[in-house]
Amino acid sequence: MRKPVMTVLFGLLLCISFSCSKDEKTEPSGDDAEVPPMKESYPGLSVSSSGELLLNGEPYQGIGVNYFNGFTRTLEDGSLYDDTYRAGFTYLKERNIPFVRFSLTGFWPKNWDLYLNQKEKYFRSLDSFITAAEEIGIGLIPSFFWHTPTLPDLAGEPVNRWGVTSSRTHQLMRKFIREVVVRYRDSPAVWGWEQGNEVNLLVDLPGDNSNLPPVVPSLGTPVSRSKEDKLQTADLNVMMTSFAKEIRKYDGTRIVISGNSIPRFAAWNLLHQKQWTPDSREQYVAILGIQNPDPVNVLCIHAYPAAPSEGYFSDETADFNGLIRASVDASRISHKPLFLGEWGAQETEYGAQTRTKFMEILNAIENNQVPLSAMWVFDYPPHDTENGINVSPDNGPREYMLQEIMKVNERMANR
């Protein structure tokens, strides 16, 4: 889910995550030659040769939550030692919520200041976050580059340099991946690595001067954008394959996730025909594979219920359950387990029917045996009123959402 500018500014500074105790970490220099050798396997989630999701070597199904600013809140001015995430982790653990997905880096270029200028403090804060997850028993899926334009902006390049492996953007990406993965790869709290958030919604959009990334110079963006700040599927392919290959230099087993949303309703036709023609079910399955290229080894979507009049495919009537069924079918074809990285029911849209809609989504997840999913969103106050979708100790009426997830997690564990 993309955040409005002011909401993101409020909730989204820098982010990284994981850890072991300080004396167990291995911090790489800028030279790969000094990185300690990679182990045969690491804790967390992996994928079997047949495409089955495993946790520490055993088949796994589970539903977690998005703890979007769980770490980034600590990087706001005066909040470096804010450890309220400990209470959040404990609250989730008591409800059998096994893992969280969260933003690992700053949304805007300005939000990278701590990492760029006071790296030791940045990692000290992240160490504390990871250690808390280890102690309380919460798994972590960090999303590295939540706002796609930010890394190129920091590198002083247009956004489409994500599609050029020799770019400064990729150089910065590789450096950051090395520092994070080598530092935290031994942590049992780390379950997987995710590239970013909904990059696929940015590709193949028509027009040279439309659908451009936002411009907020006070937060570090350029003063203007051009057609070079737009992405194509070819750029996405380079982004994802390069990210996954870099992860594999230092961690050969954990899952690597794109962080993609459900493809746009015309994604296949935008790629091949440059037209907003709705995709068929077959085209939807095909574009999922294209947008989650090897060595990314998970199919990722973010999905919220469509209006009954919209549907999902041009050639059949499909409700949310039908969408999930098609996505699971695609995952079996590709031998990549499905990660429904965001899902939820918004009170601002469904009102008194929110609980019914929530259960419809949850039933689709359970009935289709989706191996991994994460509800949007936990303990993110801006979405209390903006979307009516936040679940936290402060809004008791939505506690039922975690209670229902807990029941499904218990049934999944007992199968």
What are these model-derived regions, one by one?
Residues 44, 174-178, 182, 189, ...:
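Extracellular glycoside hydrolase catalytic/binding regions
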Residues 21-23:
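Bacterial signal peptide processing site
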Residues 26-101, 113-116, 124, 131-135, ...:
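N-terminal carbohydrate-binding accessory modules
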Residues 61-65, 100-102, 140-142, 191-195, ...:
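Hydrophobic faces of well-ordered beta-strands that scaffold small-molecule active sites
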Residues 78-154, 159, 179-181, 228-259, ...:
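Aromatic-lined substrate-binding rim segments of carbohydrate-active enzymes
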Residues 16-19:
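C-terminal motif of bacterial Sec signal peptides marking the signal peptidase cleavage site
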Residues 1-8:
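Bacterial N-terminal signal peptides that target proteins for export
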Residues 168, 350-415:
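Aromatic-rich peripheral "rim/lid" segments of glycoside hydrolase catalytic domains that contact
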